[in-house]
UniProtKB/Swiss-Prot annotation:
One of its GO terms (cellular component) is spliceosomal complex. Residues 1-39 are annotated as: Disordered. The Q motif is unique to and characteristic of the DEAD box family of RNA helicases and controls ATP binding and hydrolysis. Keywords: ATP-binding, Helicase, Hydrolase, mRNA processing, mRNA splicing, mRNA transport, Nucleotide-binding, Nucleus, RNA-binding, Spliceosome, Transport. Coiled coil: none annotated. It comes from the Eukaryota. The gene is SUB2. CDD domains: DEADc_DDX39 (cd17950), SF2_C_DEAD (cd18787). The lineage of its organism: Eukaryota, Fungi, Dikarya, Ascomycota, Saccharomycotina. InterPro entries: DEAD/DEAH_box_helicase_dom, Helicase_ATP-bd, Helicase_C-like, P-loop_NTPase, RNA_helicase_DEAD_Q_motif. Its EC number is 3.6.4.13. Residues 267-428 form the Helicase C-terminal domain. The keyword Metal-binding does not apply. This is ATP-dependent RNA helicase SUB2.
Length: 433
């Protein structure tokens, strides 16, 4: 992080010493601090074989069954038993392991809805992710008719949000929001957070690495009660950002499922193609013609390139859709929904789609433009191969800078990315049968 981001952070008390939390790799034996962990109710050794083992509310189990989920993922096995007890949680786990379900199920399990009182606050950095999290709450609370969830983000009329919050009948129990809009509502005294029991940040590294966003979050945090549960999740948590996250917590349970060198995704085939910039369009067309895929997401580095490439694909009879931050908010959401509902199979996007967005049919991710950072590569290709399914990631390498990023990716994630074979790849290696 840059020096300017090393701002003094909100803490509970200068004199309060934060005890060393239990930290472990999921699935490993007890750490050296096992005695201390026992005192706090360590999660070590708790491995549920089904969601019923978590003793969740019948309404939640019924909704989980409707979704077709039988067995919790590794991160869910580790997190849920402690998070439903109100323990603070800092969790890093690779894309596609169901981190969202951890905090959605945990907060719904603990929720006792009271009219006009906001009990759960979830903060995320993009509007699309906020929309998706709201939908997850709707999915898992379908048999809890008294529970109301609302999403608040910029680009929509703030008066509409204020009206919903003023009325006891429409005031939600669960708020999912982006930091800017939520901060504005707090400043206007339009939202009452004095009853918040759960404070969640998804993709917390992205939210807290920006100084402006972090200041907003600190102000929001101060408006909530001192005693509450704090949970933070991300696929990437650098050593620099972890202490920043823990400043908001009290004795958190720290869970790092796989260390930093092993954050690669199960079932994902990864390749690169060396070519000149002017050759990209022809190669992309060839790939879309020759590869089998359900849905594909193509990442570019700017909104202008997204629009241009989208026009080109449509002109070449590849019906695509573009999603990027340059679109009006309502249009962005409509396009996101259209792609998610399988109305289009090809999406051209900037990094607005690169984090947390979960569309289960995507099994091909193409980096038309490589990202500048290795971590962003993980979030991008993680759109394919979600929840342990197969997928294919292909990256175009056209400059010296691209070659350097590719080297960083392979070093950072301890993975060998090979050149895409001339004869192509067997669909069975990346398509689920």
């Amino acid at each position: 992080m840059s020096a300017e981001n090393q701002e003094e952070l909100l803490d509970y008390s200068d004199s309060e010493e934060i005890a060393v939390p239990t930290t472990t790799q999921a699935g490993e034996g007890e750490s050296a601090n096992d005695k201390e962990a026992d005192k706090k109710g360590s999660y070590v050794g708790i491995h549920a074989t089904g969601f019923r083992d978590f003793l969740l509310k019948p309404e939640l189990l019924r909704a989980i069954g409707d979704c077709g989920f039988e067995h919790p993922s590794e991160v869910q096995q580790v997190c849920i038993p402690q998070s439903i007890l109100g323990t603070d949680v800092l969790c890093q786990a690779k894309s596609g392991l169901g981190k969202t379900a951890v905090f959605v199920l945990s907060t719904l399990q603990q929720l006792d809805p009271v009219a006009g009182e906001i009990s759960t606050l979830v903060i995320c950095h993009t509007r699309e992710l906020a929309y998706q999290i709201r939908n997850e709450y709707a999915r898992f609370s379908k048999y809890m008719p008294d529970v109301k969830t609302e999403v608040f983000y910029g680009g929509t009329p703030v008066k509409r949000d204020i009206e919903k919050l003023k009325n006891k009948d429409t005031c939600p129990h669960i708020v999912v929001a982006t930091p800017g809009r939520l901060h504005a509502l707090v400043q206007e005294k339009a939202i009452r957070l004095n009853n918040v029991k759960s404070f969640v940040i998804d993709e917390c590294d992205k939210v807290l690495e920006s100084l402006d966003m972090r200041r907003d979050v600190q102000d929001i945090f101060r408006a909530t009660p001192h005693q509450k549960q704090v949970m933070m999740f991300s696929a990437t948590l650098s050593q620099d950002i972890r202490p920043v996250c823990k400043k908001f917590m009290q004795n958190p349970l720290e869970i790092y499922v796989d260390d930093e060198a092993k954050l690669t995704l199960h079932g994902l085939q990864q390749y690169y193609i060396k070519l000149e910039e002017k050759e990209k369009n022809r190669k992309l067309s060839d790939l879309l013609d020759s590869l089998e895929f359900n849905q594909v997401i193509i990442f570019v580095k700017s909104t202008q390139r997204a629009n241009e490439l989208n026009k080109l694909l449509c002109a070449c009879n590849f019906p695509s859709i573009a999603v990027h931050s340059g679109l009006p908010q309502e249009e962005r959401i409509e396009r996101y929904k259209s792609f998610k509902e399988f109305n289009k199979r090809i999406c051209v996007s900037t990094d607005v789609f690169g984090r947390g967005i979960d569309i289960e049919r995507i099994n091909l991710a193409i980096n038309y433009d490589l990202p500048n950072e290795a971590d962003q590569y993980l979030h991008r290709v993680g759109r394919a191969g979600r929840f342990g399914t197969k997928g294919l990631g292909i990256s175009f390498v056209s400059t010296k800078e691209d070659e350097e990023v590719l080297e960083k990716i392979q070093s950072r994630f301890d993975v060998k990315i090979t050149e895409f074979p001339e004869e192509g790849v067997d669909p069975s290696t990346y398509m689920n049968t």
